């Protein structure tokens, strides 16, 4: 081959390689169709779903003092979500939370989600992703039978115990203003503390969502018939964990359609 021909061939090959290389560098790499989102992958790699749950709310999330086992409606929902992600409903790690601690534990990544009688509000939706509601309840009042109190107006001049950072305080205050009842609120860290305060006379009423109150009802107390401000419970996840939020919502939606959600509500005597 002549020298000029050889040089021409080399030039053509070089141009072809350069063109191919440039073309490849401008194309975006396509993610595999079965790629797993980072937030879901983190759970899969860990092998366990971490959930913040209530441990002092009978029927929703309650830790048996004898066995140490946490059971309830929301625990069963957590298991269903774990099964969706990991294929095994037992792969859960539940951590007890209160109305005051559930947000910070989610913020710092100690839990993947919070499913703990967490009421959906517009303000909270600015900070967290919330699923569609899986349970709706109204705020109620638990009082001592011997008190003779039969309605909210009868609490005029009385003290009402509520949980820290809970929505029940605002709901009751708004209704109290409507009926002209001047009430004082005392805030507590846990529901058992509020019940103890009611039993000892430190407060005249215990206010929280009605389904929760039923777990603290005994022979000496009664739940007033009035209900205030419907509370919608949702599963909360960090704003950045959008894939997990979607998976949670899809799981709950499927459970509603199949009737499984209603079965669990009936199982725990919430309907």
Regions found by a protein language model. Name each.
Residues 101, 118-126, 171-176, 196-230:
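A ligand-binding cleft/hinge motif common to bilobed small-molecule-binding domains
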Residues 79, 91-153, 221-222:
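Acidic, polar ligand-binding/catalytic clefts
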Residues 16-21:
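C-terminal motif of bacterial Sec signal peptides marking the signal peptidase cleavage site
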Residues 53, 70-85, 119, 137-190, ...:
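Bilobed "Venus flytrap"/periplasmic-binding protein-like clamshell domains
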Residues 55, 135-143, 210-253, 271:
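Periplasmic-binding protein-like
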Residues 75-76, 84, 159, 166, ...:
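Extended ligand-binding regions for polar small-molecule ligands
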Residues 31-37, 42-113:
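Extracytoplasmic small-molecule ligand-binding "clamshell" domains
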Residues 24-45, 167-185, 218-227, 253-271:
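Ligand-binding clefts/hinges and TM-proximal coupling segments of bilobed small-molecule sensing domains
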């Amino acid at each position: 081959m002549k020298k000029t021909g050889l040089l021409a061939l080399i030039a053509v090959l070089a141009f072809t390689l350069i063109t191919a290389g440039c073309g490849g560098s401008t194309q975006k790499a396509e993610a595999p169709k079965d790629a797993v989102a980072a937030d879901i992958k983190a759970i899969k790699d860990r092998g366990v779903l971490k959930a913040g749950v209530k441990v002092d709310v009978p029927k929703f999330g309650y830790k048996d003092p004898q066995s140490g086992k946490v059971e309830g409606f929301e625990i069963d929902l957590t298991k269903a979500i774990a099964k969706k992600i990991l294929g095994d409903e037992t792969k859960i790690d539940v951590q007890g939370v209160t109305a005051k601690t559930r947000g910070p534990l989610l913020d710092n990544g100690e839990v993947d989600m919070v499913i703990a009688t967490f009421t959906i509000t517009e303000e909270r939706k600015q900070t967290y992703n919330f699923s569609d509601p899986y349970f709706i309840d109204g705020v109620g009042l638990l009082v001592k039978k011997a008190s003779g109190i039969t309605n909210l107006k009868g609490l005029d001049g009385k003290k009402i115990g509520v949980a820290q950072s809970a929505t029940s305080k605002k709901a009751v205050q708004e209704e109290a203003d409507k009926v002209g009842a001047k009430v004082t609120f005392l805030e507590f860290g846990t529901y058992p503390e509020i019940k103890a305060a009611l039993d000892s006379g430190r407060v005249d009423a215990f206010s929280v969502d009605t389904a929760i109150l039923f777990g603290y009802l005994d022979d000496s107390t009664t739940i007033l018939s009035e209900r205030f401000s419907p509370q919608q419970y949702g599963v909360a996840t960090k704003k950045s964990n959008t894939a997990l939020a979607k998976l949670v919502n899809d799981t709950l939606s499927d459970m509603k359609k199949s009737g499984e959600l209603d079965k669990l509500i009936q199982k725990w005597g919430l309907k």
